[in-house]
């Protein structure tokens, strides 16, 4: 244990996802050794994120305005919605350049053991988008792109049940090829692109 502010910094860094005690200590001592202007830039970036970043009112991904750039782009195909768990998954699919529709971010996956049920996710908002037409356009296809793990599969199964009531709606799932138990964000562009183009109907 270190004293005072140093230990406070290590403790706060250790709360970040994927940062263990040793990594937190390394980052803390790196920050102690860099020049003050670099610390100022980091502090300014954190302040901008806290004050200026919000969630898109339509799809739920991160945005610097009410609408994200994807939802605001009239060239995107409004008949297709790709459902993902987190904003980072939007970026993973965008890197493939295979998808030209819009997204819907659930904000997680079903996980009863952690207290995450349908009411904690943005499922109602998804159903409303489809039922009310997305910007006046009928949604023809919903692509379920949840992670290929237990929680992601449970979420996909639940969504299929909810979406069956919409006549004429095609519901598809990313094709196999993604490693089971993995996260979408870690899949390479080629694998994810093939999974998207080879998606299967449910």
UniProtKB/Swiss-Prot annotation:
It comes from the Bacteria. One of its GO terms (molecular function) is DNA binding. CDD domains: TOPRIM_recR. Keywords: DNA damage, DNA recombination, DNA repair, Metal-binding, Zinc, Zinc-finger. InterPro entries: DNA_Rcmb_RecR (IPR000093), Rcmb_RecR (IPR023627), Rcmb_RecR_Znf (IPR015967), TOPRIM_dom (IPR006171), TOPRIM_RecR (IPR034137). Belongs to the RecR family. This is Recombination protein RecR.
